[in-house]
Amino acid sequence: VGYLQNVVAIAAGELTSFALMENGEVYSWGYNSYGQFGVNNTSASNYPVKMKKVSNIIQISAGEDFLLMLDADGSVWGVGANGDGQLGLNNTNEIHLPQQMLKENGSGILYGVKEIATGRSHSVILKENGTVLSLGYNGYYQVGIGTNSATYIPTQVVNESGEAVTDAKHIAAGGDATYISRNKDSEGNNQGLYVIGRNSNGNLFTQDTGNKRRATKVQSDKDIIAMALTFNHDSTIRQTGVIVDQDGKVYTVGYNGNGEMGN
């Protein structure tokens, strides 16, 4: 018996905690009713349990009751709740052992992934070429494809003109919304963010409360270096957005019923 050591990253779902180890292994503990521990059962645990089937994991991201993992080969593994197809397996089956996400056409394994992010029940994938894929629950258009139909395989995120997003630098997701920071343009100018999805609390930095069906530009003359979307829910979802610029300044927007905005 001892402490969990050599942890390099952590993630948390609604009632489940995850730890990524230096050697690429993943451990889970807490609630496991959707099989999100990845050990082929649904038994809860009050101590860390080693996930099966995965190795060489370099990133983890937890949704409400599911986990995505990025491995060193650039493929994405998923486990747990999948009722909205958020694991990218072209089905809605609950998954108790990690499986690899499929390509955009649903055939073969997806590779070339740089970053992963998860909302409540949707997933966002940043590819090495700067394009963004999304999938899963889409009731508030958070998948960024222009409609609110759920998608069970990775689907190309499009901008306001219906063209594929190609200039993405980093991604963040939370609740029913998505942020995408953008690379500088050809002249070296900062381009701010794309925002997508649920905006009922004004959490998308667009100075309104309308949901965004496609990746919508939010201009900034500062480089965005970190982003996060938080949410809580009892009878309704409440969301707050946070970004950090190149000068280390923090900006918050959205729900502030408990002082979430820090102002």
Predicted feature locations:
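Short glycine-/Asp-/Thr-/Trp-enriched loop segments that recur within the blades
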Residues: 2-4, 60, 106-111, 162-166, ...
